[in-house]
Amino acid sequence: MEFSLSEEQKLIIDTTKKFVESELFPHEELVEKTGNLPMDLIKEIQAKAIKTGIYAANIPQEFGGGGLDTLTWLLYEKELGKANYALHWTCVARPSNILCAGTKDQKEKYLKPCIEGKKWDCLAMTEPNAGSDLRGMTASARETTSGDWVLNGTKHFISHADIADFTIAFMASGIEETNKGPKKLITAFFVDKGTPGFNVREGYDNVSHRGYTNSILEFSDVKVPKESILGEVHKGFEVANKWLGATRLQVGATCLGRAERAFNHAIEWAATRQQFGQSIGKFQGTSFKLSDMAMELKAAQLLILEAGWKYDQGTATDLDMAMAKLKASEMLAMVSDEAIQIHGGMGLMTELPLERIWRDARLERIWEGTSEIQRHIISRSLLRPYEN
């Protein structure tokens, strides 16, 4: 495996790092205190990201993006991940599901405007009674005699649906009989904002990712044409799986960035904070914490980089993605907690980013596949060779 970077790759990472420090960090206090990211600020940051060349850097060049390889993309995401997530999100186009399964017309209608910063997308899978269990969803799609589809049901926890121009909604579309019993079939649909019967309601307040909104989506006899299907009929589960692995790596890379920021604060504080006549970094209780934090950070980074390298080689597996996401998200929880402990009471003050990183860390072990789901994937992969 080769993790060394070319001068061009280093320039991309350095440009992203400087952009985060100059354009994102200054707005963190506003977003954290108000829980709101104003639309004019979103557009301002997005325009600067496009001008700088970092917006849509993860999208292939043939579609107008930057064409980053996976390894560089993850390091780019790591730098963006150091900022408040709502601000981070304004800098990246993420319609990878359309890349994976969209038709030429769908890419022209939906993908291209997203890459150009003219449209926003959102993804609707989670339901009040269907989180990790995608096949447990009850929101439904029914085909009519004319070939159109009618959608009904509710989705929730849908990120930035309040400003999205269209939604990719995953719906239960049929039942297949298998040796293990009935299996629910899923189909993905494009649903444009303003479609009759499609309603977006305000979601929930939460402790993580302030400013990064979530919404409740209601579908009441929403009629969409067959051309709105993303991928194939009843193949929505496959559509989701095509991009979910890369998304988990992105989450892991974001965790690396946050952990690195918290760790750097902890090192500086330990080296300069004086107690009992010496810096607290000289006390074994503090120095051992720093040692453990450094080791966990390095281990998570190596798993992320290895998975990214293998992804570019076409050899990455579900096991690689699960281990990387699990390790990085749990490492962030540990590092952010210990960084606060090293700072003492000051670590809980909003003048520092530590309490925000600590709050945000809690979400990373839940979304894009809980830690329990990742462990299930890992153990299943290990035991599969011994199954009859």
Residues of each region from the PLM?
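Alpha-helical interface subdomain recognition
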Residues: M1-W89, A101-Q106, P113-K118, G131-L134, ...
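Short Ser/Thr-interspersed hydrophobic loop/turn segments at strand-loop and sheet-helix junctions
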Residues: G53, Y76-G81, M171-A172, V191-P196, ...
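Short Gly/Pro-enriched turn/cap motifs at secondary-structure boundaries
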Residues: W89, C114, N129-S132, F157-H160, ...
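Flexible, glycine-rich active-site loops centered on histidine and acidic residues
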Residues: S96-A101, L123-A124, R135, E176
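A structural signal for short hydrophobic beta-strand segments in well-ordered beta-sheet cores
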Residues: A139-R142
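A short core secondary-structure module
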Residues: D148-V200
